Structure formats: C-alpha cells, structure tokens
Amino acid sequence: MDIIIEAIEQAGFSPLPSNEEDAGAFEAEGLRFGWEAKDGEAVFYTSLGVLPQHPSTELCERLLEADCLGIGTGGGHIGLYEPTRTLLYSFRTRVDGADVPRLADMLADFVGRAPAFIRETTEFSAAQSDECVMPFSGAMLWV
C-alpha cells in the first residue's frame, strides 16, 4: 500500500523490496520490521526473540505488565507466535483515510520502543538459561 510506504519513508526508515502489494518489510534502528495490510488495517511487527522453554516468572510478569492495556507498549502488543515460540511486538492501526504524517509518527513511536523490549527480553532470558535466542534478523509473520 502506497500510504504505508510513504509513512515508512517519511519516518526516516528504509523500505525493503517486496513482491507483494499488501505486505513488506523495512529497516529501522538496526532492526527489521514487517507489515501486512488487509481490510483497511495494517499490522506492523518485529521479533523480540524466542521465549525459553521454561521462562522465568520475572520474564512472564514483565511481558504481561508491559502489555497490560497497551500502556507499557504505547498501544502496541506483545504476543507469542507458538509454532516457533517467537515473541512478537506488534502494532495495528487503520490505514483507510489515515494521513501520512500521523502514520509516520505512530511508526516512529512503535519503532522507538522496540530496542528496549528486545534488550529487556534478551537479558531476562539470558539470565535464566542457556537457551536464549536473539531476535530474528528477518521479519516474519504467519499468513
């Protein structure tokens, strides 16, 4: 979708080539983010890493606390993609009728929060076990 690409560029991020009109990826803050659009909405996402097989209570509490009503995530959400145990940080918004500057601001806020969540998740995971896996370098989402 053109509005999404325009917003990504206006926010100062680098869209990556895509063969799809309603899905793609971009790079920002040294991370890769993905996006998909459908029915007038878009979801933006990135990996926070892989949830350990036996996560600590502290990690679970921190993720739930951050995700509570979207307050600690700036309206984004943290969820688990179970087949790969990947923690995803995502943000969904309407794009039909949206204006590019507002969408760019929302993306900048979303992207700005991701490194802290990744760092915190990685630190909690590494402190509790040897099975800590860093975030994927590529964006992924179930389709």
Task: Indicate where each model-derived feature is located.
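Generic alpha-helical secondary structure
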Residues: 1, 56-57, 103
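Ampiphathic alpha-helical segments that act as solvent-exposed interaction surfaces
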Residues: 62-63, 71, 93-126
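Short, internal acidic amphipathic alpha-helical interface segments
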Residues: 47-92
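Charge-rich, low-complexity N-terminal segments
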Residues: 1-34, 71-73, 79-82
